[in-house]
């Protein structure tokens, strides 16, 4: 049977029930008058209208008198021109670069973009800043990324400094058993590069040539700046022995200056006989002595271990830095001649850094990387020609000697290859640099173009013009 049709009485009763429920929720009374509900609705609507009117009024006032975007920003940049300005008290000064702006403001804040028209209504002061200071302050390399290399290409044709890990697979790292013969120019001393060091060798001395197997070897020509980056070892030459040819007191039956050997389970050991005992030496030192004076012996005499055991062990001759065995010359692989020699320097804690040599066909830059050619480049001259530091990065370093003793002046090196001295800790903080600087070799840093010192006093110098460069 169909339900009866809804009448107006049903609808009226339903509406009445809804009003009672609404009053109960709003006023806690099911019997509240409908006027109270009507008044609440009216006040809500009126409040919304007033809020809209107030918001429109604020927007109108902001349009007529906008609030300056300068606010309390210490450094701003004009949107239209990109010019930088720094606030000093209530005066805005144009500033030459971001490094100077941060030093003047004593903060590492970034510039806030503003309209040039806003700056037109402010107090303006003269130009401030350090000419030539970094315009951008890039992220410094981390300790694991900090490695230094100075390379010489084309027999002294150009020199390049590479900052960062060596990534060129064509470069061969010389092992401790390899060496390369170099000289800076015709007539200058010849050096043997081996084991992370350099030593002078006299190619006119037959004993040296034969002991190191340098017959027919022609030195590679390299820049002096590359040699300066290598720790120097004592000259490799036959040592002078006091009382040579006389009978030894320390080892009876043998002459002073003679070389003997004993056979161990691990191989042969060489000893030189001295007045008061014997000194252990390497194969190179043994050959140097024998090519100088073999004392008529065709072969190195072999003695029983118990014979030499009774002799005092001394350490008189300065031959400990000599290579133990004749190093193997590096001439490059077949079809790939050595055109570039590099000295690499990697910081190590504690003590001296690790120095190694690379030989290859070019500087060890990443694939696609191109070194920056410096304005001071002079080809075969003494100046550095190019620098590679990953674009958009910098290096915050402390100069260290090759011996590893202490740290000196701190520098910020930019990706354009210029080094800037850091005056103090406050300067480093204002520039946003890390707390600790990473060690770097001073002989390599010294080859980089030197920029002005970064200090708050230098940055605060007012100037009307900037003198043109040379």
Curated annotation (Swiss-Prot):
Keyword ATP-binding among UniProt keywords: yes
Pfam families, per database record: T7SS_ESX1_EccB (PF05108)
Keywords, alphabetical: ATP-binding, Cell membrane, Hydrolase, Membrane, Nucleotide-binding, Transmembrane, Transmembrane helix
UniProt main location, coarse: membrane
Highest taxon in the source lineage: Bacteria
Topology relative to the membrane: Single-pass membrane protein
GO molecular function, one term: hydrolase activity
GO cellular component: extracellular region; plasma membrane
Complexes and interactors: Part of the ESX-4 / type VII secretion system (T7SS), which is composed of cytosolic and membrane components.
UniProt function note: An ATPase.
Protein name (database record): ESX-4 secretion system ATPase EccB4
The organism of origin for this protein: Mycobacterium tuberculosis (strain CDC 1551 / Oshkosh)
Designated gene of the protein: eccB4
């Amino acid at each position: 049977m169909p339900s009866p049709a809804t009448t107006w009485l049903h609808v009226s009763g339903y509406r009445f029930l809804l009003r009672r429920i609404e009053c109960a929720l709003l006023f806690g009374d099911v019997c509240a008058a409908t006027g109270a509900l009507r008044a609440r609705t009216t006040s809500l609507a009126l409040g919304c209208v007033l809020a809209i009117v107030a918001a429109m009024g604020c927007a109108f006032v902001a349009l007529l008198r906008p609030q300056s975007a300068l606010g309390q920003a210490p450094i701003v940049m004009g949107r239209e021109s990109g010019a930088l300005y720094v606030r000093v008290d209530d005066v805005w000064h144009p500033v030459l670069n971001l490094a100077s702006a941060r030093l003047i403001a004593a903060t590492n804040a970034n510039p806030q973009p503003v309209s040039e028209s806003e700056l037109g209504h402010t107090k303006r002061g003269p130009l401030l800043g350090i000419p030539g200071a970094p315009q951008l302050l890039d992220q410094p390399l981390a300790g694991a990324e900090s490695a230094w290399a100075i390379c010489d290409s084309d027999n002294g044709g150009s020199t390049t400094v590479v900052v960062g890990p060596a990534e060129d697979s064509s470069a061969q790292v010389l092992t401790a058993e390899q060496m390369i013969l170099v000289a800076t120019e015709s007539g200058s001393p010849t050096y043997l590069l081996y084991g992370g060091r350099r030593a002078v060798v006299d190619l006119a001395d037959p004993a040296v040539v034969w002991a190191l197997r340098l017959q027919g070897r022609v030195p590679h020509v390299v820049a002096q700046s590359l040699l300066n980056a290598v720790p120097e070892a004592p000259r490799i030459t036959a040592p002078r022995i006091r009382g040579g040819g006389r009978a030894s007191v320390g080892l009876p039956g043998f002459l002073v200056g003679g070389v003997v050997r004993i056979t161990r389970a691990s191989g042969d050991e060489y000893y030189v006989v001295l007045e008061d005992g014997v000194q252990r030496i390497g194969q190179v030192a043994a050959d140097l002595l024998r090519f100088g004076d073999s004392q008529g012996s065709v072969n190195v005499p072999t003695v029983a271990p118990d014979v030499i055991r009774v002799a005092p062990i001394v350490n008189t001759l300065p031959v400990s830095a000599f290579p133990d065995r004749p190093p193997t010359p590096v001439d490059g692989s077949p079809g790939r001649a050595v055109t570039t020699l590099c000295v690499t320097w990697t910081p190590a804690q504690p003590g001296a850094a690790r120095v190694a040599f690379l030989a290859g066909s070019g500087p060890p830059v990443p694939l696609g990387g191109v070194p920056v050619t410096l304005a001071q480049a002079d080809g075969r001259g003494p100046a550095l020609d190019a620098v590679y530091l990953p674009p958009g990065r910098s290096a915050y370093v402390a100069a260290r000697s090759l011996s590893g003793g202490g740290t000196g002046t701190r520098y910020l090196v930019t990706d354009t290859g210029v080094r800037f001295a850091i005056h103090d800790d406050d300067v480093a903080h204002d520039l946003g640099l890390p707390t600790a600087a990473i060690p770097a070799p001073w002989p390599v840093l010294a080859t980089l173009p030197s920029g002005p010192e970064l200090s708050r006093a230098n940055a605060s110098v007012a100037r009307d013009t900037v003198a043109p460069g040379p």
